[in-house]
Regions:
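Cytosolic covalent-transfer regions centered on His/Cys nucleophiles
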Residues: 1-162
Length: 162
């Protein structure tokens, strides 16, 4: 069973920010600009510029490139209206540079958390996501899933397996 740290991925994964088979970004800045706009458009953040700055600030603290075609950029700021996770699967990978580390990225999980949120909420979401990413079944799911509903069902199945 995946350790959830009090966070259920099914509760924080955002349907409107599950974007499958998008054309690759040219760079991380284009990704951050795009995702900040999507988070604002869908009512997750009140100010896309503030959220983009929060993403960039977090990048200055350490890498969000995880290897294996995965990046987990995240931002904490008061402009986050509701905590959530967006998932983007690209058609092809692009070069993602992050705090001195770089590599190809095709799967992106973007976290938005209010800076005044619950005790270490962002760390608990990250820890839960890391638990999923260690599961071969979850990796297969993120590679092959065709819809948010399919991704959600797979997450719920994995969460209840012993």
């Amino acid at each position: 069973m995946i350790e959830t740290h009090g966070i259920h991925m099914a509760d924080v994964l955002l349907k409107e920010l599950t974007i499958l088979d998008r054309e690759p970004f040219t760079d991380k800045d284009q990704l951050f600009q795009f995702i900040s706009g999507e988070f604002e458009k869908n009512g997750v953040v009140s100010d896309k510029e503030a959220f983009q700055e929060a993403l960039m600030y977090r990048e200055s603290l350490g890498p969000t490139y995880m290897g294996d075609d995965i990046a987990i950029p995240h931002g904490r700021c008061k402009e986050v209206l509701k905590s959530g996770v967006g998932f983007i699967r690209l058609k092809d990978s692009f070069r993602y540079e992050s705090a001195g580390e770089a590599g190809p990225v095709k799967y992106i999980f973007v976290l938005a958390v209010n800076e005044a949120g619950e005790d270490n909420e962002h760390l608990r979401i990250l820890a839960t996501l890391a638990g999923y990413l260690m599961q071969d079944e979850f990796r297969e799911l993120m590679i092959n899933v065709q819809s948010y509903e399919e991704l959600l069902a797979g997450i719920q199945t994995l969460a209840t397996q012993e």
